[in-house]
Structure formats: C-alpha cells, structure tokens
Amino acid sequence: MLETSQTIPELVSWAKEREFSLNLPTERLAFLLAIAIYNAERFDGEMVESDLVDIFRHVSNEFEQSKETIATRANNAINELVKQRFLNRFSSEFTESLSIYRLTPLGVGVSDYYIRQREFSALRLSVQLAIVANEIQRASELAEEGTAKQEDEYYWRRNVFAPLKYSVAEIFDSIDLSQRIMDENQQSIKEEIAELLTKDWQAAIASCERLLDETSGNLRELQDTLNAAGDKLQEQLLRIQDCVIGRDDLYFIDQLITDLQAKLDRIISWGQQAIDLWIGYDRHVHKFIRTAIDMDKNRVFSQRLRQSIHNYFDMPWYLWTAQAERLIDLRDEELALRDEDALGELPEELEYEQLSDLHDQIVDYMQNLLIAQRERNQPIDLSLVLKEQLEGYPLARHFDVARIIVDQAVRLGMASADLSGTYPQWQEINNRGAEVQAHVIDEYK
C-alpha cells in the first residue's frame, strides 16, 4: 500500500532524529474524534481555543471527571495534541490570545480511520470500482493514441501515468484498507458471538444466527461486486501494458501496471478467502451448538423445557424451530450429522437405519430388477426407474438412493446414444424438482 523511495534505515533515522511518538489514551482519542466531528461541520476548517475547551468539556463530562480543573486539563490536552502533531497551532503577534487550530494530516488520518472508515458497503465499493473503471479505460484509450502517434515521455506521464498513479492506485489502496477493516469487523462479530453463547440459550441462538447470516451476506455481496469488475479492470490494464512493450523509456508505466495488477489480484482473492474462512467459522459455531445440546444428554435441557411448558401461562414464550430443508443443506459429505456423536442419544423410535444396511437392500433389489430387464433385452430408462423407486423413500434419502441406482445401472450396460455426442433431456425424478440427465441404456455387457 505504501510506496516510497526511502529505505528502511533512512526512515528509522528520520523518525529517531525527530523523536516521533504517539500516545493516545482513551480520553485523548475521544477528544481527537470529537474535534474531528466538530471540524467537519465547519466551512473554514479552523477552530479557536474556546471551541476546543468546549469540546473537551463534553468529553470530560462523559468520563465523569472533575469540573473544577477543566480549563487546566483542556490546556494540557490541547498542548499534547499539538506536540504529537495531531493539531497545528497558528498565532502571531497580533493574535497572541486568539490562536487558530487546524487538524494535521495525521490527525485527519487517525480520526478518519475510527469514524469514516468504519462504514463500508457494497454501494461504496461499486462507486469506487466505477471510478477506477472509467480512469483505466480513459488511460488505455490515451495509451493507444500515444502509441499510434509516437508521443513523447511527457505525454505518457501526464495522460497515462498520472491517472493510474494518483487516482487508480489510491482507490485500490482505499479498497484494501476497507477490506482490512472488514477483517476487524469479523473478529469483533466472533467475539460478540462467543459472548452470546455464554448467556441465555434462546436469545443466543437467534442472535448468533442473525450475525452469521448478515456477515455471510455482506461478504458474498462484496465478492460478487469484485468479481463483476475484476476481469474488466485486468483487461484494460493489459491493453495499456501492450502499448508500452518494447518501449524502454516507458519502464515506469510498465512497473506501475505490474503493481496495480498485483493489488487487484490481492483485493479479489481476499474476498474469496474471507468467504471460505467465514464458512468454516459458521460450521464451527453450529457444531459447537449441536455439541453443547448433545452434552446435555436429554436431561438438563429437557428439564428446562418441561419447566418452561409448565409455567407457560405465567411466562409465555416463543418456540424457535428449524426448517428441515436447511438441515439438509448443513449435511456434509461424510454424513457427520447422522453420526451418534452429532445427534446425541435418541429414543429408539427416532433412530434411522444405517446407510450401509439401506445400501445392501437397494443393491439386492435393483440387481434383481435390472438383471431381469437385461435378460429380456429391454432398455433401461433411468429417469423412469428413479422416479418409481424414489416414491418409496423419504426425501432425505433420495440422493443416496439415486446414487446407488445409477451405479448399479451403469454396471450392466451403456447407452448407444452416448456415442452420438447429443445431450439427453433433463427429466424430473421427484416432486421437489430433482432432475436427471441420462440416455436410455440399451446395450448390455
């Protein structure tokens, strides 16, 4: 993000010589933020000492500090901010008792981080990407024009290098900073969820679900916006890079294009990585909740439930239930949710038969059915077979049953239409919209 021609030893020596230091306790930081908010409402951006004292009085009241020493403490706080270069003080022989104060770039940067940069949205990102797209497109058109007319270095620095360096690169840095703040927001949400899980379960589960859904939605909306613009931006950068190939005098543009491509790749890859990490955390939270309920072993939780039902008319409550479809979505490939460790101890009437037992039953039945069709040399229409067989199984078993049936069918023969290169039509196999695409098996092994 930071581009400088100075080396690390030079910067270290520079900071050491000037004795730079930052010390902002909570009270001083609150004072600086209050100054920034007040300054934003003024047209001239200038403040006098009485303004700063009034602002400090509000901060002091919030921290419940003594009112008798406000003038002295306000003067000390102002001097500290001036000394640390958060404020500039201007005075002359004509205005000795009426100094003027302005926020320094450091003061603006720190306050802007805590105030404005906390607000991040897909709309703001879309506007930034639109500005970047216009700047890069205009620069690419001027680059192609400069190549055609054999323009000099001054033309390239003014019309191509300058927009990319001072507009596009700065917006990329702003997006990168916003993404880093999103990382902090995710961490704070994790801490909030951890705190909720130690409190009342009814409120905790609902609040955790809301926080998880909101964050997941924001990340996906963010990534969709980045993906939509990323390819176009890379294409425009490549257009400019093609124009400077073979031009040794334009090495600075080629280097800048390489840096911008790296920044853009980092911005886009961050979005997908953040989504993947959040999905893993989402699963971890749900697993934690399931484990906590499972450790209850149908005793404490059930006792609380019976007690709540007994006292319902004295203290009415809402019952939160989960949709069956969503539970199916949470199932992983290893069928972990069906294991005893995930479900806990269930009554016998609620236990399901093991998938291996079901697999053997379906294999035996389908072998007898399909082999009979092969002996009669009858074609096997998988869509019809699947539709007939799935009617006898619950929806949660449809995927497993269909996979077993297809596996047994393809072992018996093949479809001659597969060699023609044509695609079969999609056929529905249940009343929930599931479809299969397969040719009729008419050649047996």
From Swiss-Prot:
One of its GO terms (biological process) is chromosome segregation. It comes from Mannheimia succiniciproducens (strain KCTC 0769BP / MBEL55E). Keywords: Calcium, Cell cycle, Cell division, Chromosome partition, Cytoplasm, DNA condensation. It is found in: Cytoplasm, Nucleoid. InterPro entries: Chromosome_partition_MukF (IPR005582), MukF_C (IPR033441), MukF_C_sf (IPR038198), MukF_M (IPR033440), MukF_M_sp (IPR036141), MukF_WHTH (IPR033439), WH-like_DNA-bd_sf (IPR036388), WH_DNA-bd_sf (IPR036390). It comes from the Bacteria. Interacts, and probably forms a ternary complex, with MukE and MukB via its C-terminal region. The complex formation is stimulated by calcium or magnesium. It is required for an interaction between MukE and MukB. SUPFAM superfamilies: MukF C-terminal domain-like, Winged helix' DNA-binding domain. GO terms for molecular function: calcium ion binding. Belongs to the MukF family. The keyword Cell inner membrane does not apply. Pfam families: KicB, MukF_C, MukF_M. Residues 212-240 are annotated as: Leucine-zipper. This is Chromosome partition protein MukF. Involved in chromosome condensation, segregation and cell cycle progression. May participate in facilitating chromosome segregation by condensation DNA from both sides of a centrally located replisome during cell division. Not required for mini-F plasmid partitioning. Probably acts via its interaction with MukB and MukE. Overexpression results in anucleate cells. It has a calcium binding activity. Disulfide bonds: none annotated. One of its GO terms (cellular component) is cytoplasm.
